[in-house]
Design a protein with these regions (language model features):
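Structural motif
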Residues: 38-50
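Tryptophan-paired
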Residues: 53-102, 249
């Protein structure tokens, strides 16, 4: 059968559309998308003010971390409540961007850190298979996944945990070096000096606590090597959930 120019055009358009659909499916990588939460914790006796904390994802996307408890000085080392309001699944992170001020050593820390991508993906796959996903949210449908917890300890020490049911994996441990903040890091309503921004960042820290910290209280603590006790603290809850059929994980 002889093809005329119009038929050739239609065939070319069909091939183009099919190629576009295949490309979108491959680039979307649905098999590498998961629900997860991202939070930051710090020791209660080492106040921090987080300027930025977020994960960089493939395709120029990003995922912000929940920093509210840290910036309100309500954080407890190793303790985080996993929640997420994702409207859609996300690719897994490749890097962490972090910028924060530390009250007790009067330093500013900033860095971009590479994450162990293969280890993260493997952990998610295994946790899904072993039914270790946490219930992160029931908003607009139930969302199950794992929780990234970024720990900012004293002396510039940083740790990242990945958590699920009876699951806690240390992904990264790093000691950051103090840096001089850039002009953009000192902006709040207007450009501030380092001293003025520091005053703003910690203005809600009570004078009584400032006095306690100046006296050296908890000054020799080594939080980066302190076990989080995450599994120990949640064991009773998980046992109850197992017994009553709320989770399917079998230990």
């Amino acid at each position: 059968m002889k093809l005329n120019k119009l038929n050739i055009f239609y065939i070319a358009v069909a091939i183009f559309l099919i190629a576009g659909i295949v490309y979108r499916k491959i680039s979307f990588k649905a098999w590498e998308r998961y629900n997860y939460s991202v939070a930051v914790v710090s020791p209660k006796t080492y106040p921090m003010h987080i300027r930025e904390t977020y994960f960089l994802l493939p395709d120029d996307d990003f995922e912000s971390a929940d920093k509210e408890d840290v910036n309100n000085f309500n954080s407890t080392w190793g303790v985080s409540f996993a929640t997420t309001n994702h409207a859609r699944l996300k690719r897994l992170p490749t890097q962490l961007v972090v910028k924060y001020f530390s009250y007790r050593d009067n330093n500013f820390y900033a860095d971009t850190l590479d994450l162990p991508k293969k280890e993260i993906l493997t952990t998610f796959k295994n946790a899904k298979q072993n039914k270790q996903f946490l219930e992160l949210s029931s908003y607009a449908g139930k969302k199950d996944g794992l929780s990234f917890v970024i720990g900012l300890a004293n002396n510039g020490n940083l740790i990242i945990w990945l958590r699920g049911i009876y699951l806690e994996k240390e992904l990264l441990r790093k000691r950051l070096k103090p840096k001089n903040p850039l002009k953009a890091d000192l902006y709040h309503e207007r450009n501030l000096s380092r001293e003025k921004y520091f005053e703003y960042a910690f203005e809600n820290l009570s004078d009584s606590l400032k006095t306690v910290y100046k006296s050296g209280f908890d000054g020799k603590a080594n939080y980066i090597d302190t076990p989080s006790r995450y599994i120990e603290m949640n064991k009773e809850l998980w046992e109850y959930q197992q017994k009553n059929g709320y989770i399917d994980f079998k230990k």
